[in-house]
UniProtKB/Swiss-Prot annotation:
<dbReference type="InterPro" id="IPR001611">
    <property type="entry name" value="Leu-rich_rpt"/>
</dbReference>
<feature type="glycosylation site" description="N-linked (GlcNAc...) asparagine">
    <location>
        <position position="183"/>
    </location>
</feature>
<feature type="signal peptide">
    <location>
        <begin position="1"/>
        <end position="19"/>
    </location>
</feature>
<feature type="repeat" description="LRR 10">
    <location>
        <begin position="281"/>
        <end position="302"/>
    </location>
</feature>
<protein>
    <recommendedName>
        <fullName>Leucine-rich repeat neuronal protein 4</fullName>
    </recommendedName>
</protein>
<keyword id="KW-0732">Signal</keyword>
<feature type="repeat" description="LRR 4">
    <location>
        <begin position="130"/>
        <end position="151"/>
    </location>
</feature>
<dbReference type="Pfam" id="PF00041">
    <property type="entry name" value="fn3"/>
</dbReference>
<feature type="repeat" description="LRR 9">
    <location>
        <begin position="256"/>
        <end position="278"/>
    </location>
</feature>
<keyword id="KW-0325">Glycoprotein</keyword>
<feature type="topological domain" description="Cytoplasmic">
    <location>
        <begin position="698"/>
        <end position="733"/>
    </location>
</feature>
<comment type="function">
    <text>May play an important role in hippocampus-dependent long-lasting memory.</text>
</comment>
<feature type="domain" description="Fibronectin type-III">
    <location>
        <begin position="576"/>
        <end position="675"/>
    </location>
</feature>
<feature type="region of interest" description="Disordered">
    <location>
        <begin position="480"/>
        <end position="518"/>
    </location>
</feature>
<feature type="glycosylation site" description="N-linked (GlcNAc...) asparagine">
    <location>
        <position position="408"/>
    </location>
</feature>
<feature type="glycosylation site" description="N-linked (GlcNAc...) asparagine">
    <location>
        <position position="469"/>
    </location>
</feature>
<feature type="repeat" description="LRR 8">
    <location>
        <begin position="231"/>
        <end position="253"/>
    </location>
</feature>
């Protein structure tokens, strides 16, 4: 009986301890996710669990767009609506993209999965049949799956930037015959097979128009693989650390090339300009901040924009071709483009010279022969395009021929572009098409008069207008990639004059002689005029809705382009950024904390967090935090420890300095909470002591209760007579 009661008490106590342990474990699990970005919309209550718990309350049909970014998902939910057309699963923990997941979404058009951990791709030849855009940037892909056979894929845009791809195997993209935009930038790509861009049947990848190889380890552009891109219009080779030369017949099979960007490639020392003879449609060349010493001329039929600033050019009158015929060649930032005289040179160049003054120096040297410019044919014309703000303006100029009233109207195409970086991949398809019209409306562009063009009796005027130049054949997919050229912090101002020209409206001739500039007329289409009016509207003097402390804030430069608003002054990318302002920390636990900061007024490409425990020497850091982030968690901290944390901004010029005081303080100190494990074992110990005390007390009480009582028996008193006194013995009962 006694042992049975003790066993029952022990079982009861063990059950109490197990229940307490489970409750503490649930509390600990609830603390693991420090923060969660929820979907704004009808499903705000669905983020209670990271994966299939999202299915609770999710509509089975009718949903076309779903955002699951920043949900810590390790796999996509199995209950996604079949009507989805756009799915954003970026910034999660996805490890694979498989055919069953894509097969359940037959209407999917846009799939965004950048910044995950995807290392494996599994799909069949018909899996991506309806998909139009796929973004797999900044994942862990080391290779792409081979194409199983002919595919009906309609994929037009594929982004693979930031993946550890080392090589492209033959027919890597054969499954995507409709592919138009391919981004392979910032990868470890060092080799491209000759048939990498070949189709399943060995033919070319005929639809590709834009290829971005910026930031890769390629040493040269080879004709073997580029010949399979006959419709290539834009080629980006920015920030190529190993690209040394451009030569050979690499552009022999790409006659449609319009834009070549090799900017910020320090190893590029030689460009054989003869290769551009095979690109009659070339309009933009960017070689800024390379290592070129010369840049020879070639025959070009297009208006050409060239950027050469930041190169160690050697002064030579051969470079004057860039400035002689301003109707055909626009040198971007000519005043900032410098040349140095050759060592031991005895020519007219005595020191560093801006290319904007090169023509004057060469003209004064009688022994120098310049390229023919034939300026007399353009008397009284105001024509040279002006670089203002972020773009090369599209302008129209009136040329009054001596001795006649015929009007020549020339349209200089606008060329607005950028180089792709972390998250932004922009492109604009410049148009070649123009329409004839009898409309006599004339738009003047600010310019510098050609030599000999100014008349003694004429006043010259300069106005400007920005015009869109989107081809009617261009699709929204191509035309949406748009961003301006880099501009100088102090753009040079061109001479502005006034000119009054009287001309009698006549029928405009569109077939001029061979030695004159082609006459291109403004289209009298109402839609183009409406678009032109919208684009030409003056910028509003309002500040952009830019909050430097907002997490995932859209960069102000993009807001400025989108809404024509005013951004705060930012230091350039070549200047070390100012330190961020650390707002503080939140959600402090025993092993983690969430750090908040505000962006500086500088160009920032990424952030870093450095932290160290008080009294310890080892400094820990978190690097490559994306530029739009304003908060980041720190994990695996020591409980009950004081830490010193600093947030640093970084760009190509370097890291910002740590600042521990002042209003722009980038460092702070915090202390983690005591360990939950210690608290748990403390509670267990207290519970154990309470249990032992209870058991001891129970045993004592039980023993006291069941202790037998003392029994009293009858006692007979016997008295004996003392023999000495001879008394009688008396007995009592």
């Amino acid at each position: 009986m006694r042992w049975t009661l003790m066993l029952q008490l022990l079982q009861l106590l063990l059950q109490l301890l197990m229940a307490q342990s489970q409750s503490l474990e649930r509390i600990s699990q609830d603390r693991i996710p420090l923060f969660r970005l929820t979907q704004q919309g009808d499903w705000d209550s669905l983020d209670r669990h990271p994966t299939d718990s999202l299915c609770v309350g999710l509509p089975a049909a009718g949903v076309t767009t779903l955002n699951l970014a920043n949900r810590s998902l390790e796999s996509l939910p199995s209950c996604l609506p079949r009507t989805l057309r756009s799915l954003d699963g970026s910034h999660n923990l996805l490890r694979a993209l498989s055919e069953p997941v894509l097969g359940r979404l037959p209407e999917l058009r846009v799939l965004t999965l950048h910044h995950n951990r995807i290392s494996v791709l599994h799909w069949g030849r018909d899996t991506l049949a309806e998909l139009r855009e796929l973004d797999l940037s900044h994942n862990l892909l080391t290779e792409l799956p081979p194409c199983a056979g002919p595919s009906g894929s309609s994929l037009r845009s594929l982004a693979l930037a930031g993946n550890p791809l080392r090589a492209l195997l033959p027919r890597t993209f054969a499954c995507f015959p409709a592919l138009r935009l391919l981004n392979l930038s910032c990868s470890e790509l060092g080799h491209i097979a000759q048939e990498a861009f070949a189709g399943v049947d060995g033919g070319p990848l005929a639809a590709l128009e834009l290829l971005d190889l910026s930031g890769t380890s390629l040493e040269r552009v080879e004709s073997g693989w580029i010949r399979n891109l006959p419709k290539l219009k834009s080629l980006f080779l920015r920030k190529m650390p190993r690209l040394k030369t451009l030569e050979g017949d690499i552009f022999k099979m790409t006659p449609n090339l319009r834009q070549l960007d090799c900017g910020d490639s320090p190893a590029l020392t030689s460009v054989h300009t003869e290769i551009f003879q095979d690109t009659p449609n070339l309009q933009v060349l960017q070689f800024q901040n390379c290592n070129l010493s010369s840049f020879g001329p070639w025959n070009s039929s297009q208006v050409l924009s060239v950027s050469l600033f930041g190169n160690p050019l050697i002064c030579s009158c051969e470079l004057a071709w860039l400035l002689v015929d301003v109707n055909k060649t626009v040198l971007h930032r000519a005043a900032d483009t410098m040349c140095e005289p050759a060592l031991g040179s005895t020519g007219p160049f005595s020191g560093p010279l801006s290319l904007s003054h090169l023509s004057n120096v060469c003209r004064s040297d009688q022994s120098t022969t310049l390229l023919p410019s034939n300026p007399g044919r353009f008397d009284h014309s105001v024509f040279a395009p002006r670089i203002q703000g972020p773009s090369i303006e599209q302008s129209t100029a009136l040329s009054a021929q001596p001795g006649g009233s015929q009007q020549n109207i020339t349209k200089v195409p606008s060329l607005t572009m950028t180089s792709p970086t972390q998250g932004s991949w922009m492109y604009k398809d410049a148009s070649e098409e123009t329409a004839q019209s009898t409309n006599s409306e004339l738009v003047y562009s600010p310019s510098r008069a050609l030599p000999g063009a100014a008349s003694s009796g004429a006043e010259q005027t300069a106005t400007h207008i920005l015009e869109p130049n989107i081809s009617s054949a261009s699709t929204p997919l191509v035309s949406k990639y748009l961003e301006p050229l880099p501009t100088s912090p102090n753009p040079r101002s061109l001479p502005q004059t006034k000119q009054r020209t009287q001309a009698t409206p006549r029928a405009l001739h569109t077939d001029p002689p061979q030695d004159e500039i082609p006459v291109l007329l403004l289209d009298d289409d109402s839609e183009e005029e409406e678009t032109r009016d919208q684009v030409a509207a003056p910028p509003q003097d309002v500040s952009c809705e830019y909050h430097p402390c907002k997490h995932l804030q859209t960069p102000c430069a993009e807001l400025q382009r989108r809404f024509r608003c005013r951004c705060p002054g930012l230091s350039g990318e070549d200047t070390t950024p100012d330190p961020p302002t650390l707002q503080g920390v939140s959600e402090v636990t025993d092993t983690s904390v969430l750090v908040h900061w505000c962006a500086p007024n500088s160009v920032v490409l990424w952030y870093q967090i450095h932290y160290v425990a008080e009294g310890r020497s080892g400094n820990q850091s978190v690097v490559d935090i994306y530029a739009t982030a304003r908060q980041h968690p720190l994990y695996k901290l020591t409980p009950g420890t004081t830490y010193h944390v600093c947030v640093l901004a970084a760009n190509r010029a370097g890291l910002s300095q740590s600042q521990t005081s002042g209003w722009r303080r980038s460092c702070a100190t915090f202390t983690t909470k005591p360990s939950s494990v210690v608290i748990f074992w403390g509670l267990c110990t207290a519970s154990g002591l309470l249990l032992v005390s209870t058991l001891v007390l129970s045993v004592c009480l039980w023993r006291q209760r069941w202790k037998p009582h003392r029994q009293f028996y009858d006692t007979h008193l016997v008295a004996f007579k003392n023999p000495a006194r001879a008394e009688e013995v008396t007995q009592w009962e």
